[in-house]
Swiss-Prot record:
Localization terms from the record: Cytoplasm
SMART domains assigned to the protein according to its UniProt record, in alphabetical order: Gp_dh_N (SM00846)
Cross-referenced InterPro entries: GlycerAld/Erythrose_P_DH, GlycerAld_3-P_DH_AS, GlycerAld_3-P_DH_cat, GlycerAld_3-P_DH_NAD(P)-bd, Glyceraldehyde-3-P_DH_1, NAD(P)-bd_dom_sf
Protein name: Glyceraldehyde-3-phosphate dehydrogenase, cytosolic
Cited CDD domains: GAPDH_I_C, GAPDH_I_N
Site (Activates thiol group during catalysis): 177
Source organism of the structure: Trypanosoma brucei brucei
PROSITE patterns in the cross-refs: GAPDH (PS00071)
Keyword entries, A-Z: Cytoplasm, Glycolysis, NAD, Oxidoreductase
Molecular function as annotated in GO: glyceraldehyde-3-phosphate dehydrogenase (NAD+) (phosphorylating) activity; NAD binding; NADP binding
GO biological process terms held by the UniProt record: glucose metabolic process; glycolytic process
Length: 331
């Protein structure tokens, strides 16, 4: 069965989700809603400064987007309730505007005829959040779910392996995060986050993140044991998690690496990667995994106190897991 998917919001994640869908035979994008017109949408899809030119034919016919010969409905509705997803038989909507992050707002897609909704960000209410490979088996048929954040998708698989094998007493996470669309090119007003309004290309900017605390929702036994912060840095894509934890059961750094490597080849294959080479951030660009553990970057103070490093393409890795979650909730 091919899953029919609509995208609401054709920004960075919306477009990378679209690109990722082209590599799958179980998912078809049948509709896109954004305030962009179809011609500009085609241009934004065709050319990408981070991921390169789109591999395929992109054109516009009669106000619709035609990609590799397949017609995709284009709409420009501000209110999701008016989207008439039923007219194109949409199974799942990818809600990637960043605006509709709660059950009551995302439910407008259901009212418009979609069967299910995946929110591409942490939910603002108790809408369940899922990280593939970590808690996806707890899905109970909910119509509206969240794919959490890109950082939570990097951190949670790593935390799961550590907690399962050695136990986590407590931990602090820092994500060194690439620039995102919410930042300013030059200093500008940012009433809620003064530092966040400073020029993205000129500064390393300390910021808040709920990614570590969110792991407590994904792995309940870690609730209250993890918190974290972010540094926004002037790179276009690829971020890295620095996780420092105190372990319940002692383990050498090699034992920890061995456990992560085994998980990357076993139950977390396709989600968690393992690298034992001298890589840098650009080497991860385009990697579909959500977490790539760097065995050469971590350090151990003693057998109970360790710092681990894991990379992630915060666009590609996350967007690929959106599709994996879609496939999971439509089984």
């Amino acid at each position: 069965m091919v899953i029919r998917v609509g995208i609401n919001g054709f920004g960075r994640i919306g477009r990378v989700v679209f690109r990722a869908a082209q590599r799958r035979n179980d998912i078809e994008i049948v509709g896109i809603n954004d305030l962009l017109d179809a011609d500009y949408m085609a241009y934004m899809l065709k050319y990408d400064s981070t991921h390169g030119r789109f591999e395929g034919a992109v054109e516009v016919q009669g106000g619709a987007l035609v990609v590799n010969g397949k017609k995709i409905r284009v709409t420009s509705e501000r209110d999701p309730a008016n989207l008439k997803w039923n007219e194109i038989n949409v199974d799942v909507v990818v809600e990637s505007t960043g605006l509709f992050l709660s059950d009551d707002t995302a439910r407008k897609h259901i009212q418009a005829g979609a069967k299910k909704v995946v929110i591409t960000g942490p939910s603002k209410d108790d809408t369940p959040m899922f990280v593939m490979g970590v808690n996806h088996t707890t899905y109970k048929g909910e119509a509206i779910v969240s794919n959490a954040s890109c950082t939570t998708n990097c951190l949670a698989p790593l935390a799961k392996v550590l907690n399962d094998k050695f136990g986590i007493v407590e931990g602090l996470m820092t994500t060194v995060h690439a620039t995102t669309a919410t930042q300013k090119t030059v200093d500008g007003p940012s009433q809620k986050d003064w530092r966040g309004g400073r020029g993205a290309a000129q500064n390393i900017i300390p910021s808040s993140t709920g990614a570590a605390k969110a792991v407590g929702k994904i792995i309940p036994s870690l609730n209250g044991k993890l918190t974290g912060m972010a540094f926004r840095v002037p790179t276009p894509n690829v971020s890295v998690v620095d996780l420092t934890v105190r372990l319940e059961r002692p383990a050498t750094y090699k034992q920890i690496c061995d456990a992560i490597k085994a998980a990357s080849e076993g139950e977390l294959k396709g989600i968690l990667g393992y690298v034992d080479e001298e890589i840098v951030s650009s080497d991860i660009n385009g990697i579909p995994l959500t977490s790539v553990f760097d065995a050469r970057a971590g350090i151990s103070l003693n057998d109970n106190f360790v710092k681990l490093v894991s990379w992630y393409d915060n666009e590609t890795g996350y967007s690929n897991k959106v599709h994996d979650l879609i496939a999971h909730i439509t089984k």
